[in-house]
Amino acid sequence: MEMETIVSNTNNPTERRKAVIFPKQQQIMTVLGENIKLARKRRQLTQQLVCDRTGISRVTLRKIENGDPTVSIGHYLSVLGVLGLANDLTQVALDDELGRKLQDAKLLSDKGA
């Protein structure tokens, strides 16, 4: 599944390009959206209240709660902030097991070190 999003281009700032979103990535986004929606409801916050506190539209909040990958990460972060969950985002890629393995393999293969 491919999603279309606008990206900046030095020649044409509104040139449309397709962001490739694979099914597994979309599934992750969907789960994230559901988790955000559940967190909002557990706190008994209305969509309108979250929108008022973040400055985003209800359409954008609905997209976030549906896991729409075209919504900016900044908007996701704003909503997470209202829910008191923004710090959870700092855990992403914190424990980079694959990166460490790749780095260790390179360090072990370096000559003369």
Predicted regions and their residues:
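N-terminal flexible/basic segments that precede or flank functional cores
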Residues: 1-30, 89-113
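Short basic helix-loop element that most often maps to the first helix and adjoining turn
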Residues: 34-49, 110-113
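DNA major-groove recognition helix of helix-turn-helix/homeodomain DNA-binding modules
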Residues: 74-91
